[in-house]
A protein has these predicted regions:
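Acidic (Asp/Glu-rich) sequence patches and key acidic residues
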Residues: 1-126, 130, 134, 146
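Glycine-rich, aromatic-bearing surface loops/beta-hairpins
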Residues: 138-141
């Protein structure tokens, strides 16, 4: 039996920290962009009744791996990523890279990374900028194992 190890390193957050702040209406309005064929989502948006929306129905291979994966799609810059530590804890973060690996959409400062995380989180939650800043770890360093 072999074991793999990997690093989750950068600026980011534990996705579980935002779960209780998810706004069903915001999330249900976001999901049709990702699943245009889902009639139930379209009906929710048209009727304005979001009571039956369960975001977790779209996790674990049903579109997304987990909440951190959803947040990656909320980031319109395609520069943030997600990782799982092997024990089910998912992180949404920006991994550091060398300047010669940067693409044109790379953030130039730590503040720009934080702003991108805030914007993505606010797309599906009711959290304020200050609330999000409190849960962002500027020195995220987790060893995954599986």
């Amino acid at each position: 039996m072999s074991v793999s190890y990997w690093m989750i390193e950068g600026v980011g957050l534990n996705a579980a920290d935002i779960e209780s702040h998810i706004n069903k209406e915001k999330a249900a309005r976001f999901f049709p962009e990702q699943f245009p064929e889902e009639a139930d989502l379209k009906d929710m948006v048209l009727t304005g009744d979001f009571s039956s929306f369960d975001m977790e129905e779209y996790y674990y291979g049903n579109g997304f791996e987990n909440l951190a994966d959803v947040l990656c799609y909320c980031d319109d810059t395609d520069s943030l990523t997600f990782g799982d530590d092997g024990d089910g804890t998912a992180y949404f973060y920006y991994p550091p890279s060398m300047p010669w690996h940067h693409t044109s959409n790379e953030p130039q400062t730590e503040q720009e990374v934080i702003d991108r995380i805030i914007k993505a989180v606010q797309k599906i939650t009711d959290m304020t900028e200050e609330e999000i800043k409190k849960i962002i770890n500027n020195d995220l360093y987790v060893v995954g194992c599986g």
